Amino acid sequence: MPMWAGGVGSPRRGMAPASTDDLFARKLRQPARPPLTPHTFEPRPVRGPLLRSGSDAGEARPPTPASPRARAHSHEEASRPAATSTRLFTDPLALLGLPAEEPEPAFPPVLEPRWFAHYDVQSLLFDWAPRSQGMGSHSEASSGTLASAEDQAASSDLLHGAPGFVCELGGEGELGLGGPASPPVPPALPNAAVSILEEPQNRTSAYSLEHADLGAGYYRKYFYGKEHQNFFGMDESLGPVAVSLRREEKEGSGGGTLHSYRVIVRTTQLRTLRGTISEDALPPGPPRGLSPRKLLEHVAPQLSPSCLRLGSASPKVPRTLLTLDEQVLSFQRKVGILYCRAGQGSEEEMYNNQEAGPAFMQFLTLLGDVVRLKGFESYRAQLDTKTDSTGTHSLYTTYQDHEIMFHVSTMLPYTPNNQQQLLRKRHIGNDIVTIVFQEPGSKPFCPTTIRSHFQHVFLVVRAHTPCTPHTTYRVAVSRTQDTPAFGPALPAGGGPFAANADFRAFLLAKALNGEQAAGHARQFHAMATRTRQQYLQDLATNEVTTTSLDSASRFGLPSLGGRRRAAPRGPGAELQAAGSLVWGVRAAPGARVAAGAQASGPEGIEVPCLLGISAEALVLVAPRDGRVVFNCACRDVLAWTFSEQQLDLYHGRGEAITLRFDGSPGQAVGEVVARLQLVSRGCETRELALPRDGQGRLGFEVDAEGFVTHVERFTFAETAGLRPGARLLRVCGQTLPSLRPEAAAQLLRSAPKVCVTVLPPDESGRPRRSFSELYTLSLQEPSRRGAPDPVQDEVQGVTLLPTTKQLLHLCLQDGGSPPGPGDLAEERTEFLHSQNSLSPRSSLSDEAPVLPNTTPDLLLATTAKPSVPSADSETPLTQDRPGSPSGSEDKGNPAPELRASFLPRTLSLRNSISRIMSEAGSGTLEDEWQAISEIASTCNTILESLSREGQPIPESGDPKGTPKSDAEPEPGNLSEKVSHLESMLRKLQEDLQKEKADRAALEEEVRSLRHNNRRLQAESESAATRLLLASKQLGSPTADLA
């Protein structure tokens, strides 16, 4: 059951029935007896360092007076809130002891100004609410989810549950929109790893780093070292604030310049407003730009302009702002490691292990490198590198640009007479993440055995069959209740993991993500807020001038006044911003129910979210707990279906989400559709109702992926507009990925009237695929990792002669081809033209964000090498279908005709034919021309395959894997690459036609020569006969004539 606040299964809090004289009602509403408060030896703080969130989605709850850190020496429990609000007596459900009906979730508010383009996710969550009395807002800190009783009581042979802690034993998945889901596969990012929205955030490793505020480098990238203005002050409601402004300009179409403003607003909350607003979205101003006051009145109307003063020109100011913004960024981490022998389980037993056993040493060797501390110059994590007072050696490693120093219990100094081993606990007890290594036979670990307020995450690792070639490990995780979940997700049962580099990467990523996630806990959130407030107060007090915001307006913002300003881009120009534009929506998974039916279950729950769409990504952020609940790249958007206040968005493999909008009907939906047309390659779907004919047939065929492979002529399907290459997204109201192929086939066979949502093919008739699908197809091509295979002997029943196969082999692999574009860059499939030639892209001006070419080559990824032909088995080329001479293609198993179709490289076809003919001296002229005819048939097969279906074409790669020279020209984008392929195919057809014409001319010339030869031979014989007769008549000897 999903853990959304206000959803089904979420108890209503903060409401209490009004007082009444009804004894039955009073008895029914009598609260449970409060638990007894035991004595504790710990001092009771005024505000506990670790306060839990108040709902499944991080809803704020009044702080409990008791410390939630329940350890072995303190058994106190969190008390109930002292006061609750009232509920009306007329609520009948309350009288029966049933939960009250939850109100419909409200649409989250969107920050003004409307067209401010946010740089990252945390900027979307920036709040102008006045600062709280304590150190930071509770809702901002409580990004973790409240653990249920089942999570706290979950136990295994590795880990025991405890109050105040969440246990992860494996199989939990990633919590997203609609509940837990399987972890995403590359190139998709986990929700917790999404940070920057304005720029592409590529997944470079199998395990992503999560909960990192990568947008903290915004000031360093766009302000530091560049001309800008800083303003500091003390706002009455917000406290100390720091504002940075910079005006940017870039070339526009027609030679003009386009201006925008980059803005950073910092308050005492840890979230910072970062982003850009176009000058077209602002009121008209002078050529040198708006004044800082006018700009802030529009961007930050909640900020009091009178409190701001211009920052000083001291070099300390930008350095302090860098430190302030990047305090959350750290690439040096320390992790503790405790050693638990067989039969052990308590803290004292683990700290008092003097020497490491063989299994522990095997684990340490896998995890990192043992380094000598004395003289060690890298990150030392508070260890002594001069006098060896903290041990002589330690464990050190690097992972994804992070330095990690491990505090290993057996490598730290051992004190014989100290049972608590304070010299060891002084380091490990201050580590946020602790790895507990268990030998086989260890007792289950319980987090309450560790007495520390800093250790928030425990990674329990147990070895199985250690010190053998078959060593494996299992992993369990225990985290404090206010620490949000983090990845990588554990497999079911926590393993097993083989002792290899993949397990090392998994464990290191888990440790880094755990420490980053623990930063959202109350204790560390309060510490970071105090530090931030001190920096802001210092800037507002000591680093300001007497120049007010009004006085600074006459200086203007930096601009090159000599350039001509571009003409306004008209309505909708603000939609072309590279950053993320925001709308308030209610989102739900896209499993559509029948009209009039009531949605139920996890997929029927609507979650209030902020919808952010940038030039690179689309995200849904739950503002209540500050989590990204859904994300996808804009290149993965397939299509959308919209009405006045609802939009169904299809992405990836055809999955769908439903978004509902507030406000004027059609306004927000129109803005979102216009934005999607600019930043994605998707299009609008079509809804078709397809009746059956008299024989009960629908008149079309689809494959397992939902692509229409054949539409019969003069059927209802053809009349409705269904065409080959279209893609079914919904069948009878259900998304295709949510249906098994058998279930989808049953619906198509049995439904009286089939209603389908169709994604039409592109303008060339090719089916549309998302980038993730293309990436997955590239990973599924085993031939890309090996040597190229020989050409198959048959293509559609045509037997190739040896000279023909030699020609194809030379065209494919000959390294002596003349110079030209790179080998791999020339091989392109026409079906990928659908990813680049959509009509909505034509409306995008030059200033619109363009997807950078930072991803693997899609065309190479979908081009497979030929496979080795099997001598004893052959795959049928096509499957028979009614009314068609050729069958539909199986997408899961590409037809051999595609695997045997090859595109020649830069080697000229005419030169190849001439060279082969010169070498094939034993063959007759007719055999040589027959070989050329077979080549023409093969090339026609290629063209027919491309025009009939958009399947990936087998890649004819270089067997030697020779890298492409940088000096060789290469098409710049997909459209150029596809155009290059089309021109190459046209040239191939022209060469074939010319060769046929040359053959016909040559045959005609041969026939003429033979005719002339026979005529000359006859004339010669006739002349010889006449000469013989003449010589006889003259008396000449015949021997001379003979």
Swiss-Prot record:
Domain Rap-GAP: 321-539
Cellular-component GO terms for this entry: cytoplasm; cytosol; endomembrane system; membrane; nucleus; perinuclear region of cytoplasm; protein-containing complex
Phosphoserine sites (modified residues): S67, S182, S304, S314, S817, S839, S912
Superkingdom of source: Eukaryota
Modified residues (Phosphothreonine): T64
Principal subcellular localisation of the protein: nucleus
Membrane topology: Peripheral membrane protein
PANTHER family, alphabetized: RAP GTPASE-ACTIVATING PROTEIN, SIGNAL-INDUCED PROLIFERATION-ASSOCIATED PROTEIN 1
Protein name, entry field: Signal-induced proliferation-associated protein 1
Organism encoding this protein: Homo sapiens (Human)
